[in-house]
Every structure is written in C-alpha cells, then in structure tokens.
C-alpha cells in the first residue's frame, strides 16, 4: 500500500484493505478488553476506516456505535455508521460517548494533543474512557510501518505517549498493553 493511501485512504485498494474483516483485527481484543464495553455504552471510533471494527462491536456488544474518518471513501464504506470529520474537530456533542477507540490511526494525527482534547470533550465526564492502539517506535521501517510511511507517522516512546492525554486534560493515562510493534494507551477524563 502506498504512503498516500495509508494517510488518506481512498480508491479500490483502500476499500479492499480497510473494508476487510481482518483489517486491524489484531488490535480488537486488546481494545475491547481495555474499554470493557457493555450494551449501555456509546462508542466512538476515531479513524474508523471502513467501519469493520464498529460492525464487530455492534454484533458482539450491542452498544450504540458511531465512527468518524477523514476519508470520504472510508465514510461511504462505513455508512451509515460513520461521518466525515477530523480527529482535531470531532463533529459530535460534548459528553455524547462513554468510550472512544482509535485503532492504528493515532500516529497519523498532525496534532495529537488537540485530537485528545476533542476525544475528552465528547466523552461523558464520569463514565468516559479511551483506548488507542498505535504503532510503537520499534516498528518503524518494519512491515508494520514500512518506509516511506514510517517517515510520515508520529512514533512515541511509552513515556511520551502517556504524557499526551495528560497534556490534553485527562486525569489519568497508562500503557495497558505493549508489544514490540504496538502500544495500547488508555486514559480517563
């Protein structure tokens, strides 16, 4: 997949990749465990791609779901579950969701602190929590984050990653899961 398509998915190749039932499914168990979703939750998936994770959550958990993606092609693929928008300006009301997920998209966000502030804004202040599954710095240049894609992404050490939600006003943040190629960041408003 080309760098351009990974950063703003569009076209046939992107639809086949991000609309696939196995697209990023390696992250699903970790995110679902961290969020501990129940049928009364309201989940927003930021950078939802083709909506495959959202459909899985709807089937397995039965909670309310919504997604947002900056690629119009991905929003069409995820319809009617997703809307077009940017992580730095989420088109949702304050406190609308009890959980926010972001799977393998965070490292593309140009302003991660602003994106996290927006995630915090749309979270219920009492019940809210986030789970962000992102690519670890050790993966840079590997098949998980090949060049030139690796030069466009933001890779964070565990300490740097945990500091970002705290800068965005979250009260707590931690690395909940770590692999050589991935990190799972969890935070509460």
For each feature predicted by the language model, list its residue ranges.
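Short catalytic micro-motifs in class I SAM-dependent methyltransferases
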Residues: 104-107
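A conserved beta-strand element that flanks and buttresses the S-adenosyl-L-methionine
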Residues: 101
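Short alpha-helix
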Residues: 153-168
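Class I SAM-dependent methyltransferase SAM/SAH-binding core
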Residues: 44-89
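Conserved beta-strand signature within the Rossmann-like core of class I S-adenosyl-L-methionine
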Residues: 127-134
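A short glycine-rich, Lys/Arg-flanked "PGG" loop and its adjoining helix->strand segment in the class I
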Residues: 113-127
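Conserved class I S-adenosyl-L-methionine
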Residues: 1-36, 52-56, 74, 138-140, ...
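Core SAM-dependent methyltransferase catalytic element
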Residues: 177-189
């Amino acid at each position: 997949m080309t760098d351009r398509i990974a950063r703003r998915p569009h076209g046939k190749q992107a639809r086949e990749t991000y609309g696939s039932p196995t697209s990023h499914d390696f992250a699903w168990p970790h995110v679902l465990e961290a969020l501990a979703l129940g049928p009364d939750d309201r989940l927003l998936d930021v950078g939802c791609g083709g909506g495959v994770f959202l459909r899985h959550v709807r089937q397995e958990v039965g909670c309310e779901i919504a997604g947002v993606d900056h690629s119009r092609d991905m929003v069409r693929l995820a319809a009617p579950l997703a809307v077009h928008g940017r992580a730095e300006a989420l088109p949702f009301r304050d406190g609308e969701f009890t959980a926010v997920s972001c799977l393998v998209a965070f490292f593309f966000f140009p302003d991660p602190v602003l994106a996290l502030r927006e995630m915090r804004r749309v979270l219920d202040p009492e019940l809210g929590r986030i789970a962000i599954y992102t690519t670890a710095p050790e993966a840079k240049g590997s098949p998980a984050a090949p060049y030139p894609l690796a030069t466009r992404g933001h890779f964070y050490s565990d300490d740097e990653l945990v500091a970002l939600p705290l800068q965005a006003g979250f009260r707590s943040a931690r690395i909940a899961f770590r692999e050589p190629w991935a990190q799972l960041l969890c935070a509460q408003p």
